[in-house]
Amino acid sequence: MLEDKTEPVFEQDYPAYESYHNYMGRRMREEDKKMQINKAQRSIWVTFSKEGVHCYPAALEDPKLATGGWDDVSFLGHPHRHIFHFRVRIEVFHDDRDIEFIQFKRWLIRLYEQSEGSSEVLVLDHKSCEMIADELYAEISTRHPGRFVEIEVSEDNENGCNIFYPNS
């Protein structure tokens, strides 16, 4: 019978004797895990909400919207209030606060405070959730270019949009 003449491999936290074959198999699995971690697509996300008023003027006269029936939404043509909920996800390139999410959230909130002056209520005119997301993306991509961004905007956390903007 042939004896295994392979010298033992000693490594901290592993069995005192590990055959070369087992050692190499384990090391390959460990390296594969590291490669998967390095290839992972990383992102952070933040949430915030703002009170706002908007309207959908077409809802007053468009027969597909002002139906007079159970599906009538003509009331949307008049200015109405919502709490707009935002969830913003942005790509990061490493695992140690590439973008610090508390600072990112504060910056996003300040965008609305600066654009609306001292008013606590956003005046959004005819803007849809999709339009709001597109405007927000324009600001984010200027400050943090070359990253994917995903933005969700909802009315009263009930209905809304989700838009994914690939790396630019």
What do these predicted regions represent?
Residues 2-3, 10-168:
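Charge-rich, low-complexity N-terminal segments
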